[in-house]
């Protein structure tokens, strides 16, 4: 039996969501799943070409990437006819009380806004890298971190992502595929 065709689509501002998607792709490939990775900017396939689509989007200033919102709005019907998974990447998820789909305010707002019901949903904490941000982004993110009691200075990037949680999400998707 041929492995189901899995597409992984991401929207990333600073590259960390892409890194998470690449990790998911490796996990699924090790499980003999056939995957193709796309940036939302160059997704040129049809949703119906896939058995499963995994969509990942990061948060910037409290909002998910506009292109992901547009993609879901334009493809809602097609997405409802295949298996889907969605994950959000945001720094708020670094906090224990906001690191699950049930407690993360950005993910809850996103799902209400899109009215999309993926088969599997997850939230991952992102990366904080002041050195890579523009001056304006650095000031804004430092302000947000101050309000949320996070670090406002760091010479090195801080990766808050729980990579075991990413792995478990990938394995959960694989298990759902085997049941279908």
Model-derived regions, located:
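N-terminal beta1-alpha1 ligand-phosphate binding loop
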Residues: 2-29
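Short amphipathic alpha-helix with an adjacent loop that forms part of the alpha/beta core around
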Residues: 43-49
């Amino acid at each position: 039996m041929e492995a189901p065709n899995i597409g992984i689509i991401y929207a990333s501002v600073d590259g960390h969501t892409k890194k998470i998607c690449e990790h998911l792709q490796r996990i699924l490939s090790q499980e003999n799943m056939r995957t193709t990775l796309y940036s939302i900017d160059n997704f040129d396939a049809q949703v119906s070409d896939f058995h499963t689509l995994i969509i990942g989007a990061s948060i910037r200033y409290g909002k998910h990437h506009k292109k992901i919102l547009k993609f879901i709005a334009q493809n809602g019907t097609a997405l409802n006819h295949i298996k889907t998974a969605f994950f959000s990447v945001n720094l708020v998820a670094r906090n224990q009380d906001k690191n699950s789909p049930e407690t993360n305010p950005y993910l809850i707002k996103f799902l209400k806004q899109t009215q999309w019901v993926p088969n599997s949903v997850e939230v991952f904490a992102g990366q904080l890298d002041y050195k890579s941000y523009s001056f304006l982004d650095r000031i804004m993110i430092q302000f947000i971190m101050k309000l949320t009691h996070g670090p406002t200075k760091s010479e090195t990037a801080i990766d808050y992502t729980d990579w075991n949680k990413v792995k478990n999400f990938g394995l959960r998707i694989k298990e759902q595929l085997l049941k279908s």
